[in-house]
């Protein structure tokens, strides 16, 4: 808004100039805006020129424009500052990232340098340790070699009493035990262990004591054997080079007996060539002197002689080259010092601490011509004071010597000991051709019992004890790995094959089902449903049931067809011979009663039908089909006859309705016709009689009727009975049955009937009310219905069921006494309607319907109608 005071006080000239400038500026700005917006500037200029703007308005516009410019400039400056800040931040981040990368590289370099220095130091330490170990090992080897050389140089003298020998013995024991265990053992057992008991010039006695031998492993023995180079500076004393080889097994435990002149030598194969002096043949005394003189010469020669330790030479090659030592038999005075004696002693373990030398299996030690020790199987020590060596002793020694490498080789295989066999072949020089040419044939002794290899001994479990069970043998065979020794595997297979493995057979126990069935068939008449057979180990229970049901069904169909065929034949015969049948049935029981017995006999033996072959069953089924066709034809014929009879009855009833005046005379004739027709219908089935009797239900309503109760045990009538009809109690009065008259008979068959039976007519529905109480009393459809008496009902037909004795015994095979409703007859007709012969016939006649198999579910029922013997009169 413009300020009025400011406009009034300002001068006109200054105001006009300023106004013009402002107008020009505004126009320029407006034109620029129009150019920007695309609006025509001329129209706008005309309009503005027409309306001159006010000064206050122009001032405000300028202020706003200037403020806007300032704001825009500030914004541009702020944006520029922001861009600068962002650039600076980016530069700083780059610099920081570069610094971090440099630090990482530097750290990695430092870590690598540290690792390298650590590896270098570890390598230096390892090398130093290895060098120290090698130095220690070399020092140990050098000490052992020095000890060996020192001990070999000690033996310079020979004594008849064996003092030097003892020193040499103990020294060699110390020499050969190069480990710390041997040094400890030497400290525990000094050299003074072997002492002379009696030092006499003629006899030398020794005290044998047990020496604890260290247990060496094969690696220790090999390492010590490789660097052990024994020198041959030991002189030959009295023909015997006392270099004995001993085999130390890895499994050696306990104490080892040491003979006085036996050494334990670890190198497995040592071949030493010893030059022998010329042969001396002098007296015993001169021989002893010469022997003492030649000891120094021999030792000097041995120092110059080359000693070879042949580790790579196999055992068999050494034995082949020197199979037999050359020993010359001399006189008792002379001794051949150049003879090569090979001593191979096998040291075994003796657990007993006794001082017997039995633990040595072989040992031959010759000390001198004076003292000769022959350690044979019994290791007997023979010390002779004479100055002669027996040739027999030499022979025994050589035999034992040749035998020892063989057993050493056998034991090295079995006990996994050092592979090299200890063998020392002391070869004589070729200066004595006579000794080389002469060879003594040595006989190898039989191996003693203690040196039979362990795998040849039969196990105590296989020989001494009772033989194990084959199941345990199979289990051990599965658990144990196969033995590498072939003999043990053969022995195990022999012991396992010597027993026959008898597997346990699961014998199925089949019970005596025939006996059980025979006992159950005695009550087959009482129980209509037969139990199934027991399991005869057939494939499955369902298959057995199906097969059994099919077989029984086939047997049932066959029996049914047979019975129908018999019934048809009987009906034909009875129709043909009606008067004869009437005469016979007055005196005899009908033959049809035997048919149920036949059915029962067939039911008693179902195993016969079950055991019949399939071909017989097929033939029976074919016969049954043909019989079914015949039975259908006969059923159609019977149906036609029944229709004719029904028409006849209807005509009679119509006549009775029409002529009630002459009812009595007509009824007599009708009754006679009824009796004849009933006899014709009876064989075809008892159903037609019930159908005929049901026709009279419509007439039963016209006259009062009575209900008669029969006792179950006896056929007597209960007089004192109260009957309730819909809540009303009525006393039933019964007269003597002798004066009662038969008014009708009726029976009810089962609801289940095959399709061959005739269909009921409409008239049967009238009697359905009388049957309902019987169905409620007995649910089983297979019942035998007996019409015992004829009853008059006072009101609606009512039925009372009573159980007989058979029902008490078996509820399934019950016979129900049925008093069916009967048509009402005139009182005049009842007095003379039925003749006496007819009542007798009806009393004895049992009319059988279709034969029924009570045990089969498809069986139908047959009814038996029994009538009273005399006519019965009932009160009206």
From Swiss-Prot:
Keywords: Coiled coil, Cytoplasm, Cytoskeleton, Phosphoprotein. InterPro entries: MAP7_domain-containing. Its main location: cytoplasm. Residues 58-136, 549-578, 626-658 form a coiled coil. Residues 665-679 have a biased composition (Acidic residues). One of its GO terms (biological process) is microtubule cytoskeleton organization. Belongs to the MAP7 family. This is MAP7 domain-containing protein 3. It comes from Mus musculus (Mouse). The gene is Map7d3.
């Amino acid at each position: 808004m413009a300020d009025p005071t400011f406009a009034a006080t300002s001068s006109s000239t200054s105001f006009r100039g300023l106004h013009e400038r402002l107008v020009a500026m505004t126009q320029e700005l407006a034109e620029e805006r129009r150019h920007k917006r695309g609006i025509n500037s001329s129209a706008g200029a005309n309009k503005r020129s027409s309306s001159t703007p006010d000064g206050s308005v122009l001032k405000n516009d300028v202020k706003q424009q200037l403020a806007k410019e300032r704001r825009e400039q500030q914004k541009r400056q702020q944006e520029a500052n922001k861009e600068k800040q962002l650039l600076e931040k980016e530069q700083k981040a780059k610099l920081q990232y570069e610094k971090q990368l440099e630090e990482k590289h530097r750290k990695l370099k430092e870590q690598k340098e540290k690792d390298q220095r650590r590896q270098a130091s570890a390598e230096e330490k390892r090398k130093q340790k290895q060098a120290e170990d090698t130095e220690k090992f070399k020092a140990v080897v050098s000490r052992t070699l020095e000890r060996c050389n020192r001990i070999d140089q000690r033996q310079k003298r020979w004594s008849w009493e064996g003092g030097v020998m003892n020193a040499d013995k103990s020294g060699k024991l110390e020499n050969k035990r190069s480990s710390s265990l041997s040094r400890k053992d030497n400290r525990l057992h000094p050299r003074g262990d072997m002492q002379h008991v009696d030092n006499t010039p003629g006899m030398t006695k020794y005290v044998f004591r047990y020496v604890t031998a260290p247990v060496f492993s094969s690696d220790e023995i090999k390492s010590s054997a490789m660097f052990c180079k024994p020198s041959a500076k030991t002189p030959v004393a009295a023909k015997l080079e006392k270099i004995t080889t001993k085999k130390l097994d890895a499994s050696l435990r306990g104490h080892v007996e040491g003979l006085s002149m036996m050494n334990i030598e670890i190198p497995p194969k040592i071949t030493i060539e010893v030059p022998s002096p010329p042969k001396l043949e002098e007296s015993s005394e001169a021989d002893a002197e010469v022997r003492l003189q030649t000891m120094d010469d021999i030792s000097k020669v041995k120092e110059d002689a080359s000693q070879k330790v042949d580790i790579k030479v196999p055992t068999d090659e050494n034995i082949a080259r020197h199979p037999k030592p050359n020993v010359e038999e001399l006189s008792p005075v002379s001794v051949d010092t150049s003879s090569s004696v090979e001593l191979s002693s096998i040291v075994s373990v003796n657990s007993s601490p006794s001082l017997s030398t039995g633990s040595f299996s072989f040992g031959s030690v010759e000390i001198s011509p004076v003292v000769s020790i022959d350690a044979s199987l019994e290791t007997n020590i023979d010390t002779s004071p004479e100055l002669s060596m027996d040739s027999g002793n030499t022979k025994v020694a050589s035999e034992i010597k040749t035998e020892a490498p063989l057993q050493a080789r056998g034991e090295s295989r079995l006990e996994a000991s050092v592979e090299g066999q200890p063998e020392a072949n002391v070869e004589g020089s070729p200066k004595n051709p006579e000794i080389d040419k002469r060879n003594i044939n040595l006989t190898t002794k039989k191996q003693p019992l203690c040196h039979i290899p362990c795998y040849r001994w039969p196990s105590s479990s296989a020989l001494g004890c009772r033989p194990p069970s084959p199941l345990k043998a199979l289990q051990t065979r599965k658990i144990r790995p196969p033995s590498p020794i072939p003999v043990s595997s053969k022995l195990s297979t022999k012991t396992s094959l010597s027993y026959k493995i008898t597997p346990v057979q699961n014998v199925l126990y089949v019970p005596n089902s025939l006996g059980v069935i025979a006992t159950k068939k005695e009550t087959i008449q009482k129980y209509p449903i037969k139990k199934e057979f027991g399991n005869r180990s057939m494939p499955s229970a369902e298959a057995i049931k199906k097969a059994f049901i099919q077989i029984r069904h086939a047997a049932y169909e066959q029996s049914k067809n047979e019975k129908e065929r018999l019934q048809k034949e009987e009906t034909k015969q009875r129709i043909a011979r009606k008067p004869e049948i009437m005469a016979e049935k007055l005196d005899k029981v009908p033959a049809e009663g035997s048919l149920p017995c036949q059915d029962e006999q067939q039911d008693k033996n179902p195993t016969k039908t079950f055991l019949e072959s399939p071909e017989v069953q097929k033939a029976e089924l074919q016969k049954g089909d043909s019989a079914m066709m015949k039975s259908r034809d006969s059923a159609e014929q019977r149906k036609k006859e029944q229709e004719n009879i029904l028409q006849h009855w209807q005509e009679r009833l119509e006549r009775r309705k029409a002529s009630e005046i002459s009812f009595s005379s007509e009824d007599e004739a009708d009754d006679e016709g009824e009796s004849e027709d009933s006899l014709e219908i009876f064989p075809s089935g008892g159903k037609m009689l019930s159908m005929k009797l049901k026709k009279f239900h419509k007439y039963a309503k016209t006259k009062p009727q009575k209900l008669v109760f029969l006792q179950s045990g006896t056929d007597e009538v209960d007089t004192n009975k109260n009957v309730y009809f819909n809540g009303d109690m009525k006393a039933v009065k019964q007269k003597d049955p002798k004066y009662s008259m038969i008014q009708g008979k009726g029976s009810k068959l089962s609801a289940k009937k095959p399709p061959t039976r005739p269909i009921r007519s409409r008239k049967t529905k009238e009697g359905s009310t009388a049957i309902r109480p019987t169905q409620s009393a007995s649910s089983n459809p297979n019942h035998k219905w007996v019409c015992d008496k004829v009853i008059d009902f006072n009101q609606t037909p009512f039925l009372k069921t009573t159980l007989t004795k058979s029902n008490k015994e078996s509820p399934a095979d019950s016979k129900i006494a049925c008093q069916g409703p009967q048509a009402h007859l005139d009182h005049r007709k009842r007095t003379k309607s039925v003749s006496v012969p007819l009542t007798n016939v009806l009393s004895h006649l049992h009319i059988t319907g279709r034969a029924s198999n009570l045990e089969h579910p498809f069986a139908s029922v047959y009814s038996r109608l029994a009538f009273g013997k005399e006519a019965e009169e009932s009160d009206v």
